[in-house]
Amino acid sequence: MYARSTTVRGDPQALDEAIAYMRDDAMPTIQEMEGCIGLSMMCDRDSGRCIATTAWRSEEAMHDSERAVHNIRERYAEMMRGTPEVQEWEIAVLHRLHTAPDGACCRVIWGQGDPADLDDATSTLRTSMLSRLEELPGFCSISMLVDRQSGRAVTATVYESRDAMGRAAEQAKALREEFTRQLGLEVTEVAEFDLALAHLRVPETV
């Protein structure tokens, strides 16, 4: 399975309008496209940074959708008064303990490593980290997306509320440091977002 993420760093005052557009106009259109298995959107209301991600059953389906989603992406960026940055990923890990409620938040970690080590990273996450992540306060789900050519990876851990995410912060940091140390991954950024939309039909990979 594959995903395309579109990041826009825009006007915080435009977020509600952009979320409504993605929910009411873009999402119904995208979900009817061949091979689409969902859409999510996360936002930082302070900075105006917003990341919309579409998930696809295959790499071919993702690429075939590009022309159709182009105008949607441009409209979304125009509403946010920003420039879209597009990245394509393979969905390496997806595990849900339960669905995200209204008010859910997520902590996103971007990392860089050797492309040859990505399989070890996803295996380690599955076999030695998931059960410990499930014990974190308010844990809902985790996903790991990878770019096998560049060695880039991003994990998004969803919590039921911002309060729960805060209570889990120290434990999550310790797990992150253990995971990256074992695999020689460099963490390039950690950020927190409100989960504005979560309409994913992506099957579990665990």
Model-predicted segments: where are they?
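Short S/T/G/P-rich N-terminal loop/turn motif that feeds into the first structured element of a domain
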Residues: 1-51, 57-206
